[in-house]
Amino acid sequence: MKKIYLIGDCHLSRVSEHYEEDNNQVDMTFWGKAAKKIWDLDFEEMYKEDELSSGKESQKFQNDGVIPFSEIKDDGILFSWFGYVDVRTFLSAYGNADVVAYKYIKQLTGTFKNSNIVIIEPLPQFTEMLLKYEGISPHYTYEQRLYQNSDFLESLHVYAKEAGIKNFILQSEILDCLGVSKLIPEMTHDKAPHPVDGLQDKYNKKILNLFIKKALEL
């Protein structure tokens, strides 16, 4: 059975809720953390501090799904799913998509030297900036975020190619598996007391199935 380590932000935590250890074709270990952005990534420090994941958003018991970063080993296949928070909240303010993409690849290749790295492009942006209602995040238009998303992906693929990373899961593949052309507010869950940019369970399950399919193809 293939061993897959997955690291990412809150969207990965939500996807992990649908993984069944005893009824699956691949062995997956999930480390997802809410609001984790590429600019904060320092894998050496995360190993040193043994940083904890957020765990599952819908927890069956306290700390359900919470694991230390030391459980992410450099000996198998690594799926990395970061960038959503950067595109949503920060790139429009700083205009540094190229720098962020470069930092991301350097962190991955400098730390996971023995892994087969698969980069998952960031979850596509929602058409509406949902967190604006609580003042949690600055508000940027859909067009602004799409522009930054495009810049980031262009640089990401350039630096990944230079580093010898060939395996990607594209945003277009994520949208295709969901059967939509874009992410809209009606697709978000209502588990929080305010609007959040998190997908409903039925969509996260489809994304998990896409990840499993891609893992089996490697």
Where are these regions (language model features)?
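Short, Lys/Arg-enriched, disordered terminal segments
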Residues: 1-2, 213-218
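Conserved SGNH/GDSL esterase-like catalytic core that processes O-acyl groups on lipids
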Residues: 3-103
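Short, conserved phosphate/pyrophosphate- and ester-handling motifs at nucleotide-, phospho-/glycolipid
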Residues: 9, 196, 200
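Conserved alpha-helical elements of sugar-nucleotide-dependent glycosyltransferases
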Residues: 11, 152, 203
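Short, well-ordered alpha-helices that flank and scaffold nucleotide-derived cofactor binding pockets
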Residues: 17, 21, 158, 209, ...
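Phosphate/oxyanion-binding active-site loops and adjacent basic polyanion-contact surfaces
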Residues: 58-61, 199-207
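Alpha-helical cap/lid subdomain in secreted, periplasmic
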Residues: 68-197, 206, 214-216
